[in-house]
Amino acid sequence: GPKGKGKGGPAAEQPPPGSGAGKSRRRRTAFTSEQLLELEKEFHCKKYLSLTERSQIAHALKLSEVQVKIWFQNRRAKWKRIKAGNVSNRSGEPVRNPKIVRAHPGARQSLRRAQPAPADRAGA
């Protein structure tokens, strides 16, 4: 099941380009639109694949299981970003994050209320 929530295995480890790391790291896979369509369809049904499902999809799409695994891994990451709302909506307006707007409703007012006090006392 989707219990391994740590870092992925060596397959997920991609050294930054130009770092000289990564022993002959594989080229970026160019998926065909048919493959992407199928992968997206599967992802729409379930966010996590069993080993059997993964191997069946890999065979059906003539991909390696690692490719299917990594695609799902990346797709889940993208899905979580979108779900968290860090992605602009269609109108191009950035999504307002209510958590940021109302960080501390009382904080600023209490500060403002505290400042005039000494002046009032001086004027009294």
Curated annotation (Swiss-Prot):
Which Pfam families does this chain map to? Homeodomain
Where, subcellularly, is it found?
Answer: Nucleus
What PROSITE patterns does the database record attribute to this sequence? HOMEOBOX_1, HOMEOBOX_2
The UniProt entry lists the main location of this chain as nucleus
Q: Which residues bind DNA?
A: 24-83
A molecular function (GO) term: DNA-binding transcription factor activity, RNA polymerase II-specific
Q: What is this protein called?
A: Homeobox protein CHOX-7
Species annotation? Gallus gallus
Q: Which gene encodes it?
A: CHOX-7
